[in-house]
Design a protein with these regions (language model features):
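Bacterial N-terminal signal peptides that target proteins for export
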Residues: 1-10
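Short, linear, compositionally biased motifs with a strong N-terminal bias
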Residues: 14-15
Length: 373
């Protein structure tokens, strides 16, 4: 009877040892507690970088060459001088993930454990993950703001005179020794042609779409002649992109103000490094405090000496972040650009106590996406 009991206890003990080994397929350690002789890899937690894609309109105004004679056409509110000014059309707010080198850990794992990481060393998945795509990659960390990218339209050559530019566009009929009075007569002739087209006085038979096209062409020519008096306004679209890596505020409930770029209607967009006296466009980061309870729990765990000693010796399953939801807003005059973003570094660092057989992380935020038994 005793032999049977001993064998039963031995089998039970072996089962416990076996299950313990299975449960220890992988473990994570802080760098100061990492075992030097163990097989493993270093991984970093994900942090969030905010991306601001800015669309700016560059408005170039040209004074008409006959602006002083605009009274001949009864025009008002004409452009009285050449000039350039800028206005912000749109700001798109988005995010991307980068590796947080200040929060790096060591992961030990056995040969049967499959570990997938991004190019920059952020964990994507652990365990036997089937068809797990690794297309989403953390972008390598870099300091500072990206230099603004502008479209090719920023460098536009301007013709020497207003009239020459319109002639080159084919919008004016060449008239020798053009004067304001001659331009007015040209407008009158073109309007008479439009009347002839509408009344059917033009020789020949034309389809409706041909008549419409001819009328619109004359309209465009009339507008060009009128522009010689009223002036012309050319609008170009310039595109910029800025990135900011915000740091978690000491008091989460307080809004964080982050400079993005400098802007003025006279000079347009400049980077923050620009030394000129220009207003700074600022983003307001308002935390929704969604990780408040997690922060309290982690604070309690950090004060548990027995738990901390156990973690130091045996490690944990894996460290990861619970991202915080943050309202990112930019106010520019009467325009408000806003979006709610998951910012990883504003959230809470935590860990799994054990080693689940399968675990998948969100490549953009580092949050737990799936956890198996």
């Amino acid at each position: 009877m005793r032999k049977i009991i001993r064998k039963t206890l031995l089998i039970f003990a072996l089962m416990l040892i076996s299950s313990g080994v299975m449960a220890q397929k992988y473990k994570s350690f802080t760098l100061d507690k990492a075992p030097f002789d163990a097989k493993g890899l270093y991984y970093s937690l994900v942090q969030t970088e905010l991306v601001f894609d800015v669309k700016v309109e560059k408005i170039t105004e040209y004074k008409g060459c006959y602006a002083d004679y605009s009274y001949l056409l009864g025009l008002k509110n004409i452009i009285i001088s050449d000039g350039v000014y800028y206005r912000i059309k749109d700001i798109k707010i988005s995010s991307r993930s980068i590796a947080d080198s200040e929060n790096t850990y060591f992961l030990t794992y056995d040969e049967k454990t499959d570990v997938k990481v991004s190019e920059s060393g952020c964990l994507l998945s652990i365990g036997d993950v089937v068809n797990q795509k690794c297309d989403d990659k953390c972008v390598r960390s870099h300091k500072g703001h990206k230099a603004p990218k502008t479209s090719d339209t920023e460098n536009v050559s301007v013709k020497s005179t207003f009239e020459q530019r319109l002639l080159a566009q084919g919008m004016l009929e060449s008239v020798p020794d053009m004067t304001a009075e001659k331009a007015v007569k040209q407008i009158e002739k073109l309007r008479e042609r439009q009347i002839d087209i509408l009344s059917g006085s033009v020789d020949g038979t034309y389809m409706n779409n041909t008549v419409e096209y001819m009328y619109k062409q004359l309209d465009a020519m009339i507008d060009s002649y009128v522009a010689m008096f009223a002036g012309e306004r050319v609008v170009e679209e310039l595109n910029y992109s800025f990135t900011v890596r915000p740091e978690k505020p000491l008091i989460v409930e307080q809004d964080l103000l982050v400079g993005i770029f400098k802007f003025s209607a006279q000079e347009g967009v400049k980077p923050l490094s620009y030394t000129g006296d220009m207003p700074t466009i600022v983003a307001n980061l308002h935390s929704l405090n969604t990780t408040k309870e997690y922060a309290k729990l982690e604070s309690q765990k950090s004060k548990d000496e027995k738990l901390q000693n156990k973690i130091a010796k045996k490690g944990v399953g894996v460290y990861y972040r619970i991202p915080e939801k943050v309202q990112v807003s930019i106010v520019n005059g009467e325009s408000i650009f806003s979006k709610t973003i998951d910012i990883s570094q504003f959230g809470q660092i935590t860990y799994t106590a054990d080693s689940p057989s399968r675990i998948v992380f969100d490549s953009k935020t580092g949050a737990l996406k799936y956890i198996g038994k």
